[in-house]
Amino acid sequence: MEEEEHFVNIDLNDDNICSICKLETDTGTLSFCHVCFELSIEGISSATLLHSKSLRGHRDCFEKYHLIANQKLSRAKASHSTYEGVKRALSQRINRIIQYAQNRDSVTPENPGRWGAKQILCHTQQAGRKLVPQSDAQVPRYAPRWTEEASMVSESDYGKSMLDCHSAEELGLGLWPGERPQNREQRDSRQRRHSGHSREELMRKNVEELRQLNEQLLLQIQNVFEELSVVVQEKDSLSSELHVRHIAIEQLFKNCAKLPWLQIGRAGVKAANNPVE
């Protein structure tokens, strides 16, 4: 009777459905878990493996499942995170904003400050990298009566002249301490791209100039469409990644009996100190 408990009912009509993401796919694209197969060759007991030989699924789904389960997987075969580049770019943008919000007098060419140093890279168990902000960086302090000071400045002649400025060059900002000339050129090109023409300017132009403006406008529309397409593809990949993670987490809780290193108590989920590798 004890042996009968180990039998699993297999539906022979679900050959085209992935057992991890539960999505239907083309016939012949599913296979058994290659990660569990490699672990079994290395000597890992079959009782501790997450997937049996009867389960079929996508190769990427099995790899992501094992990454979440924190079992051993070679770095060469581990799929990189699809949104790793997005997180890195966002961290760099936030660092630039914080750098500009700080006291600009303390950041000079002679004393560039601590922001010129290399960013600290934190390595996770999944061989990923993320940027960690400097712990000893200066934090900008804001006066409690900043609204009153702003109103006083705006009433003065100097404040009015500053409000009349529309660009960074007119304000006298120039280049940021950590900004490259290439970034400035990209920002200026975006400003020129979004600058429109008035009706009077268009009336003074001839047909050839209007034709050139029309071609430039079509090129700008094409570039914007390509940028939007890239953003939509990134959004779809993030949605797929999130869906696979949710499914994997649910199955991890269902198969917690097969994971001896996972202890579930009243206080919550606690991982043991020595995970199975």
UniProtKB/Swiss-Prot annotation:
Keywords: Coiled coil, Differentiation, Neurogenesis. The gene is eurl. Plays a role in cortical progenitor cell proliferation and differentiation. May promote dendritic spine development of post-migratory cortical projection neurons by modulating the beta-catenin signaling pathway. InterPro entries: EURL_prot (IPR009704). Signal peptide: none annotated. It comes from the Eukaryota. Residues 173-201 are annotated as: Disordered. One of its GO terms (biological process) is positive regulation of dendritic spine development. Belongs to the EURL family. Residues 197-229 form a coiled coil. Pfam families: EURL. This is Protein EURL homolog.
